[in-house]
UniProtKB/Swiss-Prot annotation:
PROSITE patterns with a match to the protein in the record: FERROCHELATASE
Lineage: Bacteria, Bacillati, Bacillota, Bacilli, Bacillales
Predominant location category: cytoplasm
Gene responsible for this protein: cpfC
Localization terms from the record: Cytoplasm
UniProt name for this protein: Coproporphyrin III ferrochelatase
EC number of this enzyme: 4.99.1.9
BP GO terms, sorted: heme biosynthetic process
Gene3D superfamilies in alphabetical order: 3.40.50.1400
Pathway(s) it belongs to: Porphyrin-containing compound metabolism; protoheme biosynthesis
Transmembrane domains' residue ranges: none
Organism, as annotated: Shouchella clausii (strain KSM-K16) (Alkalihalobacillus clausii)
Keywords, in A-Z order: Cytoplasm, Heme biosynthesis, Iron, Lyase, Metal-binding, Porphyrin biosynthesis
Binding site for Fe-coproporphyrin III: 13, 30, 46-47, 54, 125
């Protein structure tokens, strides 16, 4: 019997794959407005600092294909066909939905490579996918809104944190800073669950890994005049050092799933500048990337979503 094909729509932010794509990528983020020469030079310098371009494009491909491979090892009657849809660079989300339609895919499950729900990220990805499917008459897409409580995801971070804590001279002198991408403060007025989901993730992981001292921070805020969620991780580091005198800071950007510009530059370069300035130790566990433990956790998320549909 031929296996039923189901589309696996993996959505992510996207990143420039080469230097020539930096300007059009940021122009898309800015809704068609080109960045100034000064802003563009700053962006190019950041990419140069992490090796020229971000490894995110490669990692996202590995995550999408790896997730499909894990799912297909588990399934007997279904074959998942991966489609990558990106927010700010090709293949765009709409391209992926169109390709599924062209390939004869009638049913798909979508997952965003971000564990926490927010109106700015996950909701906007799912909305774009659904609107395109409605426009072209299919496929039927079953969306996933968040997966930060998935046991395998939490277990992955628990193990990473425990391994990294072994490097600290004293657990009492260590502070773990859990972080995610900052968003405009106005999401709080809209009752967006994003900040609370980060807090919940931090509490769960601190409990699982027996972390005695931890705080919540925000990072990588946009360059706009409106207020963004804080405290910023760098300011928080200075404040905690002044008040508590911690000798080691461990940064856990649990809102991200890959080593990209926000981690390799904003954490490994900018936060490390702060810890060096304070004369304290900098630690950061390896990110999920395409780690098998992480891919299995995502596979569990997708399988549960599909089961909920089938059993209705």
């Amino acid at each position: 019997m031929e296996k039923k094909k189901i589309g696996l729509l993996v959505m992510a932010y996207g990143t420039p794959r080469k230097k020539e794509e930096i300007e059009p990528y940021y122009t898309h983020i800015r809704h068609g407005r080109k960045p100034s020469e000064e802003a563009l030079a700053d962006l190019q310098e950041r990419y140069e600092a992490i090796g020229g371009t971000s490894p995110l494009a490669r990692i996202t491909d590995e995550q999408a294909n790896g997730l499909a491979a894990v799912l297909n090892e588990q399934q007997e009657d279904i074959v998942f066909v991966p489609y990558l849809g990106l927010k700010h660079i090709d293949p765009f989300i709409e391209d992926a939905v169109q390709k599924m339609k062209n390939d004869g895919i009638e049913t798909a499950v979508s997952i965003v490579l971000a564990p926490h729900f927010s109106t700015f990220s996950v909701q906007s990805y799912n909305k774009r996918a659904q609107e395109e499917a409605d426009r072209i008459g299919g496929p039927t897409i079953y969306t996933i809104e968040s997966w930060y409580k998935e046991p395998g995801f939490l277990q992955f971070w628990k193990e990473q944190i425990e391994n990294e804590m072994k490097k600290a001279d004293s657990i009492d002198d260590l502070c773990v800073i859990f972080s995610a991408h900052s968003l405009p403060e106005k999401i709080i007025q809209a009752n967006d669950p994003y900040p609370e989901q980060l807090r919940e993730t931090a509490d769960l992981l601190a409990d699982m890994a027996n972390v005695p001292n931890y705080e919540i921070g925000w990072q990588s805020e946009g360059n706009t005049p409106e207020p963004w969620l804080g405290p910023d991780v760098q300011d928080l580091t200075r404040e905690l050092y002044a008040k508590k005198g911690y000798k080691t800071f461990m940064y856990c950007p649990v809102g991200f799933v890959a080593e990209h510009l926000e981690v390799l530059y904003d954490n490994d370069y900018e936060c490390k500048l702060v810890t060096d300035e304070l004369g304290v130790r900098y630690l950061r566990p390896p990110m999920p990337n395409a780690d098998t433990r992480f891919l299995k956790a995502l596979a569990d998320v997708v399988t549960k979503r599909l089961a909920a549909v089938v059993t209705k």
